[in-house]
Swiss-Prot record:
<feature type="binding site">
    <location>
        <position position="210"/>
    </location>
    <ligand>
        <name>Zn(2+)</name>
    </ligand>
</feature>
<dbReference type="GO" id="GO:0008270">
    <property type="term" value="F:zinc ion binding"/>
</dbReference>
<dbReference type="GO" id="GO:0008616">
    <property type="term" value="P:queuosine biosynthetic process"/>
</dbReference>
<comment type="similarity">
    <text>Belongs to the QueC family.</text>
</comment>
<dbReference type="InterPro" id="IPR018317">
    <property type="entry name" value="QueC"/>
</dbReference>
<feature type="binding site">
    <location>
        <position position="207"/>
    </location>
    <ligand>
        <name>Zn(2+)</name>
    </ligand>
</feature>
<dbReference type="InterPro" id="IPR014729">
    <property type="entry name" value="Rossmann-like_a/b/a_fold"/>
</dbReference>
<feature type="binding site">
    <location>
        <begin position="13"/>
        <end position="23"/>
    </location>
    <ligand>
        <name>ATP</name>
    </ligand>
</feature>
<dbReference type="GO" id="GO:0005524">
    <property type="term" value="F:ATP binding"/>
</dbReference>
<keyword id="KW-0067">ATP-binding</keyword>
<comment type="function">
    <text>Catalyzes the ATP-dependent conversion of 7-carboxy-7-deazaguanine (CDG) to 7-cyano-7-deazaguanine (preQ(0)).</text>
</comment>
<dbReference type="GO" id="GO:0016879">
    <property type="term" value="F:ligase activity, forming carbon-nitrogen bonds"/>
</dbReference>
<feature type="binding site">
    <location>
        <position position="197"/>
    </location>
    <ligand>
        <name>Zn(2+)</name>
    </ligand>
</feature>
<keyword id="KW-0671">Queuosine biosynthesis</keyword>
<keyword id="KW-0479">Metal-binding</keyword>
<keyword id="KW-0547">Nucleotide-binding</keyword>
<feature type="binding site">
    <location>
        <position position="213"/>
    </location>
    <ligand>
        <name>Zn(2+)</name>
    </ligand>
</feature>
Amino acid sequence: MTTDAPQKAVVLFSGGLDSTTCLAVARRDGFLPCALSFEYGQRHKVELEAARRVAKAMAVTTHLILPLPLGSIGGSALTADIDVPKDRDIGEMEADIPVTYVPARNTIFLSMALGWAEVLGASDIYIGVNALDYSGYPDCRPEFIAAFEAMANLAVKEAVEGRLAIRIHTPLLHLSKAGIVELGTSLGVDYGLTHSCYDPAPDGLACGRCDSCLLRRKGFEEAGVADPTRYRPSL
């Protein structure tokens, strides 16, 4: 007796807490995850090492890392010589669009994922956007995701011809960071392999002070789960 092979799904995958949880959710949902990462000129390039570690630990058989020179465009603290904000409270984080916003990044990432999905014959794309903890980012909003999905179904040959419908999955969209940690923990995610810091030390240790580090620490604390992150010794 033979069984049908699981359907493929493209998972946008940075090696961070959110995208790793998203990868675990895609697998839980019965898909064969095809992980897609980008080397886009980010100052925290160490996240790609985390992505490789996680992919290996989770036995991901297809992991593509694409070069994408967004550093040539700049305009973000993650891709240009702009200071990463530190020691901000939640109110400050949510007050406006932060300088860590990378212009059109999720639009570009999702477009690349869409192209790869078309080649793979996949109709499902997972992205770990979160509208609660990153309310300042325009490309993490439900309206953006809905608009991109509508566009995708007008852009892909087989969707236009009626043979498939592109679905953008956002399982973390309305979860708090604590809720994400709880979900991933229930799915067996090893968060010690992941990386979230925007401004890591040369040896990869997290700064513990950027928005991403602070939200990550807050998530573990509120979830009552031990934080496995390795922070700089001064913290």
